[in-house]
């Protein structure tokens, strides 16, 4: 009975710290220092949320740039089902998926002359990635230009405008946020 009081007081102290003080403190600091990120990095147009800068969307029309395939089950880019496909490189099912994706991309992009960029046929580890390389976006220019009656030069400039350099120059590669790029495309039509 003697050891019960210190154990109970330690339990209550840790419960208060880890269940109350720490979550409230991190929430307050996050809202204070990083309000945009703490609230989901939402892209807004007026009062309307158009997407998140961190999660891809399923753009399927010919007038949009397409991102990486989503690995989430049931519905593409579902953040509640985040996770990779977990198919090994040696798995024949992965080969079938990639072959089907390449065939679909070739059919949708008949004017593209080079090989299909790898990130357009392979899902990311989270299954929610919204970034592709500027080269993968440029590969899709003929299809988007034709669907939107825009010039190749206009789309090349738009890709360059929305390309982001890596945080450290020699680590990583430039990327294009597909959600932001496609929203910019929609603004061109207005």
Curated annotation (Swiss-Prot):
GO terms for cellular component: plasma membrane. One of its GO terms (molecular function) is P-type potassium transmembrane transporter activity. Its main location: membrane. It holds the Pfam family KdpC. InterPro entries: KdpC. Coiled coil: none annotated. Keywords: ATP-binding, Cell inner membrane, Cell membrane, Ion transport, Membrane, Nucleotide-binding, Potassium, Potassium transport, Transmembrane, Transmembrane helix, Transport. The keyword Ion transport applies. The chain crosses the membrane at residues 10-30. It is found in: Cell inner membrane. It is a single-pass membrane protein. The keyword Nucleotidyltransferase does not apply. PANTHER family: POTASSIUM-TRANSPORTING ATPASE C CHAIN, POTASSIUM-TRANSPORTING ATPASE KDPC SUBUNIT. Belongs to the KdpC family. The system is composed of three essential subunits: KdpA, KdpB and KdpC. Part of the high-affinity ATP-driven potassium transport (or Kdp) system, which catalyzes the hydrolysis of ATP coupled with the electrogenic transport of potassium into the cytoplasm. This subunit acts as a catalytic chaperone that increases the ATP-binding affinity of the ATP-hydrolyzing subunit KdpB by the formation of a transient KdpB/KdpC/ATP ternary complex. This is Potassium-transporting ATPase KdpC subunit. It comes from Escherichia coli O6:H1 (strain CFT073 / ATCC 700928 / UPEC).
């Amino acid at each position: 009975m003697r050891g019960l009081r210190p154990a109970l007081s330690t339990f209550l102290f840790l419960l208060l710290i880890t269940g109350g003080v720490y979550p409230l403190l991190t929430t307050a600091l996050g809202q204070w220092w990083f309000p945009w990120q703490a609230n989901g990095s939402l892209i807004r147009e007026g009062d309307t949320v158009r997407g998140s800068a961190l999660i891809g969307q399923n753009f399927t029309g010919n007038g949009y740039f397409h991102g990486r395939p989503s690995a989430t089950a049931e519905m593409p880019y579902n953040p509640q089902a985040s996770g990779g496909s977990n198919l090994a490189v040696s798995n024949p099912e992965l080969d079938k998926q990639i072959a089907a994706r390449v065939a679909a991309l070739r059919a949708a992009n008949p004017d593209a002359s080079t090989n299909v960029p790898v990130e357009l046929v392979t899902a990311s580890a989270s299954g929610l990635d919204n970034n592709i390389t500027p080269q993968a976006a440029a590969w899709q220019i003929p299809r988007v230009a034709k669907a939107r009656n825009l010039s190749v030069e206009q789309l090349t400039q738009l890709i360059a405008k929305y390309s982001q350099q890596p945080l450290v120059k020699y680590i990583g590669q430039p990327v294009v946020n597909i959600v932001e790029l496609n929203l910019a495309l929609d603004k061109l039509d207005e």
